[in-house]
Amino acid sequence: MANDFRFGVGMWGARSRSAWQEKVRRAEGFGFDVLQVPDHLGAPAPFPALLSAAEVTSMRLGTYVLNACFYKPALLARDVEALDRLTDGRIELGLGAGYAREEFEAAELPFPSAGERIEYLGHVTRYLREHQPTVPIMIAGSGDRIMTLAAHHADIIGLTGGRSGSTAADPLAERIEFVRTAAGDRFGELELNIVITAVPDDASGIPDLSLTRRHAPTLSDEQLLALPDVLTGSPRDMADELRRYRDSYGITYFSVQQQHAESFGKVIAELR
């Protein structure tokens, strides 16, 4: 398992090609290694956005994450192959099972059960493994079925800070141990990623919890501040916390959303 840190930034939305490319340049200037774009209706299509970004950055280029249920495996593999070639092999493909019923309805697609969506994600993943074996795959989630799939087939495990409703004393450690058991001998080859959802943007050291609260609306501020995807304190304090995550959990790949890019850049500087 890698010991070197990597940092990803999730970005989306720009009024024009020039505005998008300027956002990408700024992100690279903050020290990020990977540009990650989402896959949601209403946001720019991920592959054209990544191809445009490739013109102005040396960062690796990824999705966080493609809704696998939107794609037929052979057509997706064709697009991934073309994108990887046109970006000189910089693609990292993040995959998920999809969760927003309204997006399936807008796309005029049936909304399968969670189990059926994960089963289809497995079908897509195995096809890509066979036909595009050199493109790294991330699978993100928290439940047992999707984490088992990730442990067996992914290169990168996208952790969400623990399992919703978990009663474990340390939900993040519990999920990592689950992946370790499911992965067996290949666990040492896996890279662990977590998305940091809250970062202080001023000298107070107190983060804006609005993004975190969107995913955990029933928790109090005190409970939100205790979550592993929330950082507090100075850039040096946060850097020390990420070192602890590496040493205690084996997590070396950290991602933030674009609104936190500049603030998190100061943390990256502490770790480089």
Regions found by a protein language model. Name each.
Residues M1-R272:
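Active-site-adjacent structural elements that line small-molecule/cofactor binding pockets in enzymes
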